[in-house]
Amino acid sequence: MDGLILNTEDLYTIGFQKVASRFGKEFTFALKCKIMGQKSEEFAASIIEDLDLPLTVEEFLTETRLVFQELFPESKIMPGVEKLIRHLHQHKVPIGLATSSSKVNYDLKVQKHTQLFDLLEYKTWGSSDPLVKRGKPYPDIFQIAAAKFPDNPAPEKVLVFEDSINGVRAAHSAGMQVVMVPDPRLDRTLAPEATLILNSMEDFQPELFGLPSFSNVSPISTI
């Protein structure tokens, strides 16, 4: 969801930097790449350790939560995403959401986009779901999300969309195909596991994966 469907990765950067600045530290893009896809407690611990912040995980999360309560409701849909989601829904292709976000943060982020997210019938919130024991790059969240599809698809029949290195590795570990739409600053050689890497979701051609090319139908499921 974050950075792929919504522009919330930019909002996370603002929030994390606001906390880091209090201690004269910088939340770098390299650190951002390291934590993307992790569960809340995991990324908080990583940031605290890397920046040597004098905070507990709970203190860090509490402070950033106050910032995100203002930022997240202003989230925007990324280019090409709404077109694809509505297209797949129209052709009755099962679509799920596998986000490392908590349910509370999810609700903040989608306040202005509820109709679109209602089309994602099968949802998994990694930071709120006790079944998701480990965040990305472990495959847990994708395995749990895929199990919610009524047709119980084989892993190779599931197509994952991701923007993070951790997410790509998680999908690959789950045995799934994965299309990566990364931040333009990312070194793409760091994601050799990606089935396909695109500059934008606007560039995605569904027919390459047996999905309806805006006129055909296929049994593949997506997360």
Where are these regions (language model features)?
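Anion (oxyanion) recognition and catalysis
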Residues: 21, 89, 172
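Active-site neighborhood of HAD-like aspartate-dependent phosphohydrolases
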Residues: 1-33
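Conserved phosphate-coupling serine/threonine residues in phosphotransfer and NTP-handling enzymes
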Residues: 4, 99-101
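Asp-based, Mg2+/Mn2+-dependent phosphohydrolase catalytic module
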Residues: 86, 102-223
